[in-house]
């Protein structure tokens, strides 16, 4: 047989093996009995079924009463478990019965700081490679919940906020379990380097004392990302925290600041193409800086309050956005999200934020989609601008008192041309 024919035959065998594996898995799932209601008859597995269900969630395991959550569905099964167990496990089936439950009690507890399609990271730990289609189990905080555990997606969790248990086996992430519905208290803002997400070099300083991963540093000391992260693996994070009331600055190697300082913590993260800089800041403080970046101080106080509510609603709506999850951030500081300039805060905007603390807009019990623009001729648009279907509250309307004039029909005058040239610079 020629070498080319051997290669072809080997490829066919590998493909055939993959098809058989998928077929067995589908048969296992199809033979399970879904629970559809209180009065539904409990069925068992087909007696001919044998195999393994990986990373399922055991809801109940008592003699002849085993309930399993697997791939988003709840199933009944028969068997005699060695002991009661609730949690993530591999389940062995033999002739339709549960013959073995391989518990996975090894977990890492902490805050979810980043994730991608291939890895998951918990605060204080290096990223771990993850199972494909990593299962995420959301456990209700109330013991009286109608659905005590449901299967969700990793995007249901909030980077920098969600407290989770990462189930680990053989140094690999097998599943994520979250025991609470997270209301984000902090925002992680990616501080972009122009259009880039990374910096080739990165220095941080402060006019006050500060700490680097808990180690005290004197004021005016420059922290060099390269020195701290040299030799570390991709994904390694270092948290820099100012003393109470202090600010942190991105600076050059001599300690000369670039622009204004940041409240909250700065997180330096090593990536393949350089370093990422993230500002972790309490939600309300973030809104304090967004508000004057998005609306002039000269606007009416009620308008400032309304903008604060819009900004807060928009931010909460973006917390589960996975665009920057791999960098451990929720959003960035550009106008692609909201303008976030760490400039001096102002009393009037600070008060507008304080007077609306925690307030958001909802529609039918869910956060409203808040879209707003910097400049308007008095006519609003709906979501067609973003090639999306518009909800009932986003309408294209004329917001002027009088009918909008068609300015395209007005003749240009020397005066209007001069005004335009001055405005254009």
For each of these PLM feature ranges, what is it?
Residues 2-425:
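Conserved, single-site charged/polar hotspot
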């Amino acid at each position: 047989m020629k070498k080319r024919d051997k290669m072809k035959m080997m490829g066919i065998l590998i493909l055939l093996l993959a098809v058989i594996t998928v077929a067995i898995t589908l048969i296992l799932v199809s033979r399970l009995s879904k629970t559809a209601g209180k009065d539904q008859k409990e069925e068992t597995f087909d007696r001919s079924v044998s195999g393994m269900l990986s990373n399922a969630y055991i809801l109940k395991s008592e003699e002849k009463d085993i309930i399993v959550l697997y791939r988003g569905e709840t199933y009944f099964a028969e068997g005699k478990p060695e002991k009661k167990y609730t949690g993530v496990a591999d389940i062995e089936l033999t002739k339709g019965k549960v013959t073995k439950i391989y518990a996975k009690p090894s977990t890492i507890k902490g805050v979810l700081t980043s994730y991608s399609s291939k890895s998951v990271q918990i605060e204080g730990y290096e990223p771990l490679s993850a199972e494909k289609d990593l299962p995420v189990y959301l456990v209700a905080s109330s013991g009286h919940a109608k659905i005590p555990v449901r299967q969700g997606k990793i995007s249901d969790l909030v980077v920098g906020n969600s407290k989770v248990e990462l189930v680990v086996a053989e140094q690999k992430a097998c599943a994520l379990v979250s025991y609470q519905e997270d209301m984000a208290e902090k925002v992680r803002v990616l501080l972009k380097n122009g259009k880039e997400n990374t910096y080739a070099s990165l220095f941080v300083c402060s006019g006050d004392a500060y700490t680097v991963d808990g180690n005290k540093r004197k004021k005016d000391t420059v922290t060099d990302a390269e020195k701290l992260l040299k030799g570390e693996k991709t994904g390694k994070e270092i948290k820099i925290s100012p003393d109470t009331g202090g600010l942190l600055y991105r600076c050059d190697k001599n300690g000369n600041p670039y622009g204004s300082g940041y409240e909250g913590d700065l997180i330096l993260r090593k990536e393949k193409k350089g370093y990422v800089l993230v500002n972790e800041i309490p939600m309300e403080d973030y809104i304090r800086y967004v508000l004057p970046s998005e609306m002039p101080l000269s606007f009416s106080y009620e308008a400032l309050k309304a903008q604060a509510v819009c900004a807060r609603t928009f931010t909460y709506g973006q917390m589960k956005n996975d665009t920057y999850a791999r960098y451990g951030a929720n959003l960035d500081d550009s106008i692609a999200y909201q303008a976030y300039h760490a400039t001096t805060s102002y009393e009037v905007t600070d008060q507008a934020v304080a007077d609306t603390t925690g307030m958001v807009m909802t529609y039918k019990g869910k956060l409203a989609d808040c879209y707003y623009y910097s400049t308007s001729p008095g006519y609003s648009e709906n979501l067609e601008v973003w090639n999306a279907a518009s909800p009932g509250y986003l309408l294209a309307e004329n917001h002027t008192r009088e009918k909008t004039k068609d300015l395209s029909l007005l003749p240009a005058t020397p005066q209007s041309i001069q005004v335009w040239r001055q405005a254009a610079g």
